[in-house]
Amino acid sequence: MSKLKITYRKSAIGYSHDQKATIRSLGLRRLNSVVVHDDTPTIRGMIFKVRHLVSVEELPDRDAPADHPGDDMKR
């Protein structure tokens, strides 16, 4: 399962209480704090609700084999 790196970029001051609660539920406490969550529909829905306050990056799946050039030349 892939992971999502979520960074809290903009303050929730002036936004509705449920958006502030969503930020807290994601585990974000201070501006520029970063959390990593599994990529699930629940987390995606929370991110969608506060997409104007956070930035999101997909992290590569660590379980998948890495495709490195030159691996076929190793003995």
Curated annotation (Swiss-Prot):
The keyword Ribosomal protein applies. InterPro entries: Ribo_uL30_ferredoxin-like_sf (IPR036919), Ribosomal_uL30_bac-type (IPR005996), Ribosomal_uL30_CS (IPR018038), Ribosomal_uL30_ferredoxin-like (IPR016082). GO terms for cellular component: cytosolic large ribosomal subunit. Keywords: Ribonucleoprotein, Ribosomal protein. It holds the Pfam family Ribosomal_L30. PROSITE patterns: RIBOSOMAL_L30. One of its GO terms (molecular function) is structural constituent of ribosome. CDD domains: Ribosomal_L30. Part of the 50S ribosomal subunit. This is Large ribosomal subunit protein uL30. It comes from Roseiflexus castenholzii (strain DSM 13941 / HLO8). The lineage of its organism: Bacteria, Bacillati, Chloroflexota, Chloroflexia, Chloroflexales.
